[in-house]
Regions:
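Secondary-structure transition/hinge residues
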Residues: 1, 131-138, 250, 313
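Bacterial N-terminal signal peptides that target proteins for export
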Residues: 1-8
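Terminal and linker regions of secretory-pathway proteins
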Residues: 9-13
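C-terminal motif of bacterial Sec signal peptides marking the signal peptidase cleavage site
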Residues: 15-18
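Acidic/polar low-complexity interaction segments
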Residues: 20-136, 140-147, 153-187, 205, ...
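Extracellular protease catalytic domains of secreted zymogens
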Residues: 110, 116, 123-129, 146-392
Length: 392
């Protein structure tokens, strides 16, 4: 079902409704939202709690601007003196401008007046929900990031650096909402799983990278080739955590299907995912020779976390994952700025409470065995619960 078709049922209400002045939260609006019980996207009434201005889309979860263009070179992000502030100052060729959301009210509800308004209000609702869930899971101090809608973002090859449907771009510490694609069933910015994944990536940057625009290990690669493995490990781990949180918030192991059909089957978490020697061998291959694909290894982590949640205590697993972020940062700092796969996995287990630890140990040791993860120190002190399906 396309976005325009989802919007049709309420058009009649707009004819009789009058245009209103600007309003601020709290208020309820009709948006495109995910229904986990029926596993569909539909128009639904949702409460928005953090908008200071609906008309301007300004709020404590992030401020929206639209249009403009930006180009950022990888070499610029790797300068030792680069900061998010300096990169933002130099990246924009034409500045995005303010938005003016058109809406009407009827029967105490806000109705976005057109597709553009529906897109922005629906995204903001998904962003609020993702941030609220992250707070429940133990991360309540996520900084609000700018939101750029339909901004033309390019790299040195004049390609989008967010080619896989991602919404969050770390070097600029900002959300970028792509132009709507009529071929997509649900645009990524309206897909709750995609938004939750983006929020997880932001949380990783804020904690593990201490707010740096890139992985600190990336600055070591020129003089320490071993740092390349760390960079690739981190790319996969943060994607795996993002995919897990996207699955947990939607209760849908195939949330990719609605927006990312080209990668959906490869990232779906409804089937066993196992590490391989090929994944291990890819970790130290320079990107100039073969660009690293972080998704296969990331999917192994996401599956291990999701299956642990299904078979034990999902709250314990997800709060453990969120609580592990400082431990992952510490493991990287204690290893000369380089992150080892086993150390990161052990940090997740160590931060997990109760019987879920044993299930998590079983899943991680099973899924990552082919990547030479045969022992996790924390697992030596807890009972390892064998997973339902084996990779060995």
């Amino acid at each position: 079902m396309r976005l325009a078709r989802i919007a049709l049922p309420w058009l009649a209400a707009l004819v009789a409704a009058g245009c209103t002045q600007d309003i601020s939260s709290p208020f309820s609006a009709v948006v495109v939202a995910w229904d986990p019980a029926n596993q569909i996207y539909e128009l639904a009434q949702v409460k928005l709690s953090t908008l200071v201005s609906l008309r301007d889309m300004q709020g404590t979860s992030g401020n929206v601007t639209a249009g403009g263009s930006a180009r950022l070179l990888t070499s610029d992000t790797l300068r030792p003196t680069a900061s998010i502030s300096s990169l933002r100052q130099g990246a924009f060729l034409t500045a995005p401008g303010p938005v003016a959301v058109e809406f009407n009210t009827a029967n105490g509800l806000v109705y976005p007046e057109d597709e553009a308004a529906l897109e922005l209000v629906s995204f903001y609702a998904a962003l609020e929900k993702s941030r609220a869930e992250l707070s429940i899971w133990g991360f309540s101090n996520l900084v609000a990031a700018p939101i750029f809608s339909h901004t033309d973002l390019r790299n040195e090859d004049f390609l989008s650096p967010l080619a896989e449907g991602e919404l969050f771009y770390e070097p600029l510490n900002a959300f970028f909402l792509p132009v709507l694609n009529p071929k997509q069933q649900i645009p990524p910015q309206l897909n709750l799983g995609v938004v939750a994944h983006a929020v997880a990536i932001q949380a990783w940057q804020q904690v593990v990278w201490a707010g740096a625009p890139v992985d600190p290990a990336a600055l070591l690669v020129a003089t320490d080739p071993a740092a390349l493995t760390s960079v690739h490990v981190a790319q996969s781990l943060r994607i795996g955590i993002g995919d897990f949180l996207g699955t947990l918030i939607t209760v849908d192991p195939r949330w990719f299907d609605h927006s990312l059909p080209q990668t959906a089957s490869a990232r779906a978490l409804d089937q066993l995912r196992c590490g391989s020697a090929a994944m291990l061998n890819a970790l130290d291959v320079p990107d100039k020779d073969v660009p690293y694909d972080p998704y296969p290894l990331g999917t192994v982590l996401a599956y291990s976390l999701w299956d642990s949640a299904l078979n034990s205590d999902p709250t314990a697993v997800v709060t453990g994952v969120v609580a592990a972020l400082p431990g992952i940062a510490a493991a990287q700092n204690q290893n000369g700025g380089k992150l080892a796969l086993a150390a990161a996995l052990d940090a997740i287990v160590a931060a997990t409470q109760g019987s879920a630890q044993g299930y998590l140990c079983g899943e991680l040791l099973n899924g990552f065995h082919a990547l030479s993860v045969t022992d996790l120190p924390t697992c030596d002190t807890v009972g390892v619960h064998a997973p339902p399906a084996s990779c060995q």
